[in-house]
Design a protein with these regions (language model features):
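C-terminal subregions of glycosyltransferases and related glycan-biosynthesis enzymes
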Residues: 47-178
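Conserved nucleotide-sugar donor-binding catalytic segment
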Residues: 1-66
Length: 178
């Protein structure tokens, strides 16, 4: 990013470690900063056990705070405002997977319960979406996803029981509409 753009949006916001980079990118995009995908490595970030990316709970809390801060802006364009439910849903699912991946299954459950309020489909379809999303996130990170390990965990079983209580019986039906 050019220095002028960083200064224009106020740089990194110290309220959001370790997700201040996500906040910065959102601010730049909202102000119209043009970007291009470079097909070469320009910066190398080494992930290790003590890096920010391996500290599950602080990363999760910070990313959710960034999302809340972004959508709490009163002057968001209507097109961006229309994406809020979808963005929140996807972000909460990613956070849940990330917490599962970093050894915080209780946190995973809490974030999937929050995602429940933003789901665009029935309860059963949401469950399928969550498993498919976890599989895709793991694949994109180059890690193995053990579906049986996830779905047989006490946290997942508790989540399913919670979901069944939250779901209307008619909502549990999956239709095959053409």
């Amino acid at each position: 990013f050019r220095r002028e753009w960083l200064q224009y949006v106020g740089g990194f916001d110290p309220r959001f470690p370790p997700a201040e980079d996500t906040n910065l990118v959102l601010k730049l995009a909202l102000k119209g900063c043009k970007t291009a995908w470079l097909r070469e490595i320009t910066v190398c970030y080494r992930q290790h056990e003590s890096s920010a990316m391996h500290k599950g709970l602080p990363q999760a809390h910070s990313l959710l705070a960034v999302t809340d801060d972004f959508f709490n802006q009163s002057d968001l364009p209507s097109g961006v405002r229309l994406m809020e439910q979808s963005v929140r849903y996807g972000t909460l699912i990613w956070i849940a997977w990330y917490l599962y991946h970093t050894g915080h299954p209780k946190g995973m459950t809490e974030y999937l319960q929050q995602a429940w309020d933003y789901r665009p489909n029935s309860g059963i379809e949401a469950l399928v979406t969550w498993v498919e999303s976890f599989s895709e996130f793991a694949r994109s990170w180059g890690v193995e996803f053990r579906i049986n390990e996830l779905t047989s965990s006490s946290e997942w079983q508790g989540l399913v029981q919670w979901m069944l209580k939250e779901t209307n019986p008619i909502d549990q039906t999956v239709t095959n509409d053409p």
